[in-house]
């Protein structure tokens, strides 16, 4: 994560100096989506079966039924599936990899 932070700062510095950080932006998108997916998967696995149920009503005001597992475990499965699509929207990771390759090989 520290490496991602430093890379982000480099991209910002590059943009501020007038250089378009095309390759840096693509690499940040790829790596950021992979990190988010892996951390959500790890968290889901660490919580175990209690991360599986998602009852949206439990987050509504006035919900007074017992939740399945700890309160923080409820949205984990939903978050996991939301983070799976990060590599697709905003330009799929495959497209971003093509941008990096073209930038690197000056195509």
Which functions belong to the PLM regions below?
Residues 1-107:
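Alpha-helical interface subdomain recognition
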